Design a protein with these regions (language model features):
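Symmetry-related core transmembrane helices of the 12-TM Major Facilitator Superfamily/SLC fold
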Residues: 170-189, 406-429, 484-488
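Cytoplasmic membrane-interface "Motif A"-like loop-to-helix N-cap segments
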Residues: 77-89, 137, 291-305
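Glycine-rich segments within core transmembrane alpha-helices of 12-TM secondary carriers
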Residues: 140-165, 179-183, 362-377
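Central cavity-lining transmembrane alpha-helices of secondary-active solute carriers
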Residues: 56-74, 275-288, 368
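Conserved MFS/SLC helix-loop-helix module at the cytosolic interface between two early adjacent transmembrane helices
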Residues: 67-103
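C-terminal ends and interior cores of transmembrane alpha-helices
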Residues: 90-104, 306-319
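Short amphipathic helix-loop junctions that connect adjacent transmembrane helices
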Residues: 37-53, 238-269
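Intracellular juxtamembrane helix-capping segments at the cytosolic ends
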Residues: 121-135, 337-351
Length: 501
């Protein structure tokens, strides 16, 4: 009886700050995913930017949202979560609003970088709040509420985007700015800082821990291998959206959904990719979590990666709208299966005395996944898919693709399926040869990572020469890509060599 009463009253075991934090998470993620569900289409179709330019923009913006949480958490601990939340929501509001008012590439890029800075500062503050406002008894449920607020925001916001973009595309940006502006009110007047830890890390220690993690070749090898799967994920915000627009005959889905009165008029557009992804997770995450709860981390990860790449195989062999939906849903099931167990696996392979530190850097997969995925998808789409895209009238009429065009489409998606296979094979090899923290595995990983860093540096040098000296004029996009590769590759070489001295 007491246990039943406890379960009924679990909602009342959380302080008000916990619920305010989740409300903020819901609206911030709604603003973020609402805009990004259509951003790639808007930049290409409305503003006329090239796919490759959009890919570069997205890669840097998305990567920044994964890098900055390192500093956002440290600043929150030192200055107080409430102050940094006010800064974060101010930057988010300014970034979204400014991006909606500009139509030149550079200014939109700058505006979205401001947005990404706000998002990166915001992320660790909410997870920190949830962690500090829950107890051992209710933390599992508390983090469940947190994850639901993320996916529910990502699921519902694109429905609003589907409606409001019909009036004016800029309203999508303005609505995202509005959601973040409104969150300034609870941040300023309702939210209270959770109790701070007794020992607040100075920024110097945060940077020292970052160097410790980045110099661990065995850990970085795991990040690199797993980030290959996230190359597939970031197609959901670029190439998948363009493919839906350019190749998919959507009338059957439109006709079916029109039968639901509340959805009339219905048009299956880009934003529904995010709706399918987030909706699949919202509907099935509890079931998948229960099935995998007591299973070992690595086998579940491997199965999830395999399911995810099968979603891209589905995209490769049909351009039916229903099969397109199935492909996105299958990938989403793979994502929700693999990703939670990834964090469990990090806890197993990290040095046991530094597990908490390493868990704080597990998100680095998103940096590499976005930098490679957004650029690769955009380059391949512009070169291989855009030239064979049929006229819009043919797509609307459902005219089948020619055998040659269908073959190219199949090859395009099979490239990403192959990357999924590469990730799966890499994870199997990693678990077999690198999962234990021994001098032998560390030395082997150090040699591999040094080789990877050298290759990236060499490619960066080639891109630099290509952009400055082998082209009639400076290729700014290639120049930026070369600088990123030189920073990552060269920095990796220096860190690796320093760790051996």
């Amino acid at each position: 009886m007491n246990e039943e009463k406890k379960r009924k009253n679990i909602f009342f075991t959380f302080p008000r700050t916990f619920w305010i934090a989740n409300l903020m998470e819901f609206f911030e993620r709604g603003a973020y995913y609402g805009l990004n569900s259509v951003l790639a289409v808007y930049l290409v179709d409305v503003l006329g930017f090239r796919q490759q330019s959009v890919g570069l923009l997205q890669s840097i913006v998305y990567a920044l949202t994964y890098i900055l949480p390192i500093f956002g958490g440290a600043l929150g601990d030192r200055l107080g979560y409430r102050k940094i939340l006010l800064v974060a929501f101010s930057l988010l509001t300014i970034g979204y609003f400014a991006a909606g008012n500009f139509d030149t590439y550079g200014l939109i890029f700058l505006s979205l970088l401001i947005m990404a800075t706000g998002s990166g500062l915001f992320k660790p503050l909410i997870t920190g709040t949830v962690a500090r406002t829950t107890t051992k008894e209710n933390s599992g449920f508390g983090f469940g509420v947190y994850y639901w607020s993320i996916n529910l925001g990502a699921f519902l916001a694109p429905f609003f985007v589907s409606w409001i973009k019909g009036f004016n595309w800029r309203y999508v940006f303005f609505s995202s700015a509005l959601w973040c502006f409104l969150m300034l009110l609870p941040a300023a007047f309702v939210y209270k800082d959770p109790e701070r830890p007794e020992n607040v890390k100075p920024l110097r220690k945060v940077l020292k821990e970052a160097m410790l993690v980045l110099s661990d070749s065995r850990f970085m090898l795991l990040i690199i291998v797993y980030s290959t799967f996230w190359i597939l994920y970031f197609q959901m915000f670029g190439s998948v959206l363009w493919y839906l627009r350019d190749f998919i005959y959507r009338a059957p889905v439109d006709a079916f959904m029109q039968r639901i009165p509340i959805l009339r008029p219905f048009k299956f557009d880009a934003e529904f990719v995010t709706i399918i992804n987030a909706g699949t997770i919202v509907l099935l995450v509890v079931l998948v979590s229960r099935i995998t709860k007591n299973l070992k981390a690595f086998p579940v990860m491997a199965v999830g990666i395999f399911i995810g790449l099968c979603g891209f195989v589905v995209l490769a062999f049909t351009h039916s709208a229903w099969m397109f939906i199935l492909g996105i849903a299958v990938f989403s099931i793979g994502e929700m299966t693999a990703h939670p167990k990834y964090y469990s696996y990090i806890g197993l392979v990290a040095p046991q005395d530094k597990k908490a530190v390493y868990m704080g850097y597990a998100f680095l997969y998103g940096v590499f996944g976005s930098l490679i995925g957004s650029n690769l998808g955009a380059v391949l789409y512009e070169r291989n898919m855009a030239p064979i895209a049929p006229p819009a009238e043919a797509v609307v009429s459902g005219v089948p693709l020619s055998p040659d065009a269908f073959s190219q489409v199949r090859s395009f998606w099979l490239i990403f399926a192959a990357l999924g296979i590469l990730c799966l094979a890499g994870m199997l090899l990693y678990d077999r040869f690198f999962s234990e923290d021994t001098p032998k595995t560390n030395l082997r990983a150090w040699r591999i990572m040094l080789g990877i860093y050298v290759i990236i540096t060499a490619v960066g040098v080639y891109f630099l020469i290509l952009s400055l000296f082998l082209s009639p004029q400076v290729q700014w996009r290639t120049l930026v890509q070369s600088l990123i590769m030189l920073a990552f590759g060269g920095g990796g070489v220096l860190i690796s060599l320093r760790s051996k001295t």
